[in-house]
Amino acid sequence: MKIVKRSQLIPLISILTVIAMVGCQPKKEQSSATAEKVDIPLIQAKVVAVKIPKQKLCLEDGCTSYDLQTVETKQKWIDEYFINRMKKAEPNAFANIADQKVKVPADEPSLSESSTYVRFLGQNYNLATFAIQTYSYPAGAAHGMSHQEFVNFDLSNKKHITVSELVKPDMNQKLRDELYVSNQNWLEDHNIKKEQLQVSDNYYYGVNGIVFVYPLYELASMELSYYCSSADVEESAFIVGQPRSEE
């Protein structure tokens, strides 16, 4: 797998600093905004168990065992982001529902598993990267399904940075084409045509550049997710931002 050459990348600081200023704003306002001194917190995350009414909930169609872990960062907006994500994904785990009698035949599996773990991966100036690792096993299934989502925060502006904010307007398809060329051998080996490849909304900043992550089975019927790096891609042509050094 190829990766982007360091000389072709926008520094991480630069990308994150200007993300919040995307749009039609006067240059003068942009200059004064970047000149402002912003206190960037140092993230120190502690893994904690999420408090839910019960670890195992039984309904008529079976029981589900929950294992939920998050992080405490002393940044309320970050901590709330992950809790709210879990509440949306697993509403039954947070609802104080009384157990019901399971109506599944005794000779059939009735216990499902669901786990979500949040982990802090690292910080580079105003960029903080986390990972949400999920695993679900439906009762009676041949195997469970796992997924890892990377979450990137701009600490100076207190916001989650999505791919739609990261990629310049009208450049999504051109970036897709460049990604395909950079990873063409692997993609062709798995019979994946250019029009089937999309710029993933799951990404992280690697040592040498941005890496787009594709979950299980999205690109091919295989047990490993695929990491699609942009090689020989001039990222400044696609990614929002201008270089700015930390002072």
Located regions from the model:
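Compositionally biased intrinsically disordered regions enriched in Thr/Gly
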Residues: 25-246
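Bacterial N-terminal signal peptides that target proteins for export
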Residues: 2-12
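C-terminal motif of bacterial Sec signal peptides marking the signal peptidase cleavage site
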Residues: 20-23
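Hydrophobic helical h-region of N-terminal Sec-dependent signal peptides
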Residues: 12-18
